[in-house]
UniProtKB/Swiss-Prot annotation:
Keywords from the named record: Antibiotic, Antimicrobial, Defensin, Disulfide bond, Secreted, Signal
Cellular component, GO annotation: extracellular region
Name under which the protein is recorded: Beta-defensin 135
Cellular location(s): Secreted
Alphabetical list of PANTHER family matching this protein: BETA-DEFENSIN 123-RELATED, BETA-DEFENSIN 135
Pfam families: Defensin_beta_2
Keyword DNA-binding: no
Gene that encodes it: DEFB135
Native source organism of the sequence: Homo sapiens
Family listed: Belongs to the beta-defensin family.
Secretion signal span: 1-24
Described function: Has antibacterial activity.
Disulphides: 37-64, 44-58, 48-65
Length: 77
């Protein structure tokens, strides 16, 4: 009887730790917040689109790509 209980406990623990491959990870909204920059107006990407500019780096490989209408006006020389 004890063997059956241990086996049942192992099966239940195995099912609890199983993560389906298609739905694992944070949801889309959380990913968007953590992959954004420039006051949530920009997106961290390896390469910016044609209509975007970058001013800062998100990390060592990603650029903060921002639409020029959200960038401040540069003054000076």
């Amino acid at each position: 009887m004890a063997t059956r209980s241990v086996l049942l406990a192992l099966v239940v623990l195995n099912l609890l730790f199983y993560v389906p491959p298609g739905r694992s990870g944070p949801n889309v909204y959380i990913q968007k917040i953590f992959a954004s920059c420039w006051r949530l107006q920009g997106t961290c990407r390896p390469k910016c689109l044609k209509n975007e500019q970058y001013r800062i780096l998100c990390d060592t490989i990603h650029l903060c790509c921002v639409n020029p209408k959200y960038l401040p006006i540069l003054t000076g020389k």
